[in-house]
Amino acid sequence: MALWAGRFSKEIDAGVNAFNSSIAFDARMYRHDIQGSIAHATMLGDCGIISKEDSSLIIQGLKEILADLDSGKLEFDPNAEDIHMFVEAELTKRYGDVGKRLHTSRSRNDQVALDLRLYLRDEIAEVRSLVHRFAVALVRTAEQHTETVMPGYTHLQRAQPVTFAHHLLAYVQMLLRDLGRLDDTAKRMNECPLGSGALAGTTYHIDREETASLLGFDAPMANSLDGVSDRDYCIELADTLSIIMMHLSRFSEEVILWCSWEFKFIELDDAFATGSSIMPQQKNPDITELIRGKTARVYGDLQTLLTMMKGLPLAYNKDMQEDKEAIFDAVDNVKLCLETVIPMLETMRVNKENMRAAAARGFINATDCADYLVKKGMPFRDAYKISGTLVAECISRGLTLETLPLEEYQKMTPLFTEDVYDAISLETCVRGRVSQGGPSPKAVAEQLKLVKAKLELA
């Protein structure tokens, strides 16, 4: 019979039991379930709710179960309803009536809320470490390419010259915001629901401050109804993970473009690419395509959580069992994608020559041509029109701004002199963009200094 079977006269239907069970996915929280139970048993003994002897035996038994699960000596019972019931049943099997005292003044409602917070707190730390590693890998790559000129794009059209370092540092800024969001989520979720009971607390004189402290929380949750029914932290984490995946997907999309024959800006290491079953010439960026695809999956996990919670009255409802598969899936996929993209970035080859050649085409120095006139006193809109007219002239004659004869410039305005060619060279265009956050080597050096400080890099 189930541990909750007192008011029932029949065994639960086998099909219903399988449908109701969550052990298949919540077993991964066994360490956190046992960690929470050890703190709870400690508090029960300290408060005199159970004897110190029983408290010690319960803690001893829980540690034995933890060791046996870690070593593989003990396996999860697939027929158990959930990880909480499995651990309690195993404790009772080993220690008899003493094990039955563990659940005093506790409900599975506050127990599962505790387990999930403990588990996700650890997972956030792991995701944070991976995001940090990815940011570091981007910084290290950027440091090697402060002089590597490439086209900057708007609308996927060549727009203005930048450097590869400048481009990569844009992603570092995204990841820094991701780190901040992870920290904010971890801080907000670091309150302890244990002691909330089923929904209305308990009649026992428990010490919620003690269990919160033992488990590393900042404080107990202030309201018992909220303690068992809150899943904001899951939704907030899924939202943060979705933004991380959006950043990974944008990076992946660019890698997909850059390693195509149409761009050839980079080449993936053979260990991080795949081939075709029929086309022998193919070298496919499957990793980045999968990251792009998995982004949709993580977005779906966020929507699952939002939709699941939107119509639930207070307090706990069985619908909330579905929170775990969604948030576990989101965490697992973000970690998997980060673990894969980091070595891919670290091993890819950058084709500097192709990047510069692409920057030399497409009139990406047209703005600098206009700025040349502005610096000589012409209003920007007039200079803009002249530069656009010169671009049209170049296109009609198959020329570039660098190869257009000086007399053609001077037909437009005598402000053009021989020095225009230096002013519109790619290197000058990049070096001249000295504004804070820009692509000039000086501005990039300052950006590198700032992000390395934030990432605590030497």
Which residues does each predicted region cover?
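Short runs of predominantly hydrophobic/aromatic residues within well-ordered alpha helices
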Residues: 37, 84, 88, 234-237, ...
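Charged, flexible cofactor/metal-binding loops and thiol motifs
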Residues: 121, 128, 143, 151, ...
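A helix-coil-helix interface module used to build multimeric assemblies
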Residues: 1-201, 206-212, 274-275, 286, ...
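Generic, well-ordered alpha-helical scaffold segments in large soluble proteins
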Residues: 40, 61, 65-68, 90, ...
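Glycine-rich cofactor/substrate-binding loops
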Residues: 1-36, 97-98, 279-458
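Short, well-ordered beta-strand elements within core beta-sheets of diverse protein domains
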Residues: 40-50, 119, 166, 235-243, ...
